[in-house]
């Protein structure tokens, strides 16, 4: 038997053909397994929810539409990503459109310069720090020192633009306006003037002084009354705001001011 096997001669050409066929077969099997794994992975990805990615894209688009680039202006992304007990106040962080800003300011406000348009009142990328993202991350209960305009390390207080200041303080003299522009008061002054009720509530909860006066000698209730923010006036009164002096100094063309003066004198 062994001699018979030894006598059989295998053609080298046939051997190469056989080896090639085996190699091709092995390659096809490997490729099939790889394709199957890829299809399984793709099917798994296809079943994943896309809401997170959609939300992220919408956020980026929103930021891009605000300042013309994909770069977040002054920490806007940090504000959006912040998850804290102050999220309710964050809902009042509205400054991206003319409509929202105009509705907050009211329609009866005056300007010194008639050429100032409503578009100029809109917060731009440079004005985004009116309420920095730190307003929702760096506050702690009773932290009144960090909410005071006298604190040199104030993180929540920043100057308003000139057109905005003209609307907030239409009855202020130009001299006082210049002082006020450089030292606009505490964050509570700004929130009260802008009509941001939830921000006002948050600032008071975390220690803001409702009777603090700014460089022009006015407290938050003065600006809330001047701009007809009734709910904020009521809240400030509830929290102990001293309204008698402030309200008497307000231009009585404001219906709210007239009502409060009537209450004072009766």
UniProtKB/Swiss-Prot annotation:
Composition bias, Basic residues: 18-31
Disruption phenotype: Produces significantly smaller lesions and fewer spikelets with blight symptoms on susceptible wheat cultivars.
Superkingdom per UniProt: Eukaryota
ANK repeat extents: 183-212, 216-245
Region (Disordered): 17-36
Keywords: ANK repeat, Nucleus, Repeat, Transcription, Transcription regulation
GO terms for cellular component: nucleus
Function, as annotated: Transcription regulator; part of the Fg3_54/C64 gene cluster that mediates the biosynthesis of the octapeptide fusaoctaxin A, a virulence factor that is required for cell-to-cell invasiveness of plant host. Positively regulates the expression the Fg3_54/C64 gene cluster.
Name under which the protein is recorded: Transcription regulator FGM4
Species the sequence originates in: Gibberella zeae (strain ATCC MYA-4620 / CBS 123657 / FGSC 9075 / NRRL 31084 / PH-1)
């Amino acid at each position: 038997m062994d001699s018979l096997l030894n006598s059989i001669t295998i053609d080298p050409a046939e051997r190469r053909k056989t080896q090639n066929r085996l190699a091709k077969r092995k390659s096809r099997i490997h490729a099939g397994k790889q394709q199957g794994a890829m299809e399984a992975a793709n099917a798994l990805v296809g079943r994943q929810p896309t809401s997170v990615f959609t939300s992220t894209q919408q956020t980026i688009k929103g930021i891009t539409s605000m300042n013309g680039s994909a770069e977040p202006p002054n920490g806007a992304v940090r504000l959006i990503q912040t998850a804290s007990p102050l999220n309710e106040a964050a809902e009042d962080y509205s400054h991206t459109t003319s409509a929202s800003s105009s509705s907050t300011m009211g329609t009866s406000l005056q300007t010194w310069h008639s050429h100032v348009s409503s578009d100029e009142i809109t917060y731009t990328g440079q004005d985004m720090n009116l309420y920095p993202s730190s307003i929702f991350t760096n506050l702690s209960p009773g932290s009144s020192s960090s909410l005071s305009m006298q604190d040199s390390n104030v993180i929540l207080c920043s100057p308003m633009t000139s057109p905005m200041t003209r609307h907030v303080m239409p009855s202020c003299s130009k001299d006082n306006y210049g002082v006020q522009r450089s030292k606009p008061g505490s964050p509570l002054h700004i929130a009260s003037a802008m009509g941001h009720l939830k921000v006002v509530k948050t600032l008071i909860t975390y220690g803001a002084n409702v009777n603090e006066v700014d460089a022009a000698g006015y407290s938050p209730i003065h600006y809330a009354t001047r701009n007809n923010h009734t709910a904020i006036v009521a809240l400030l009164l509830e929290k102990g705001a001293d309204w008698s002096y402030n309200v008497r100094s307000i231009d009585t063309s404001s219906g709210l001011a007239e009502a409060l003066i009537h209450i004072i004198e009766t």
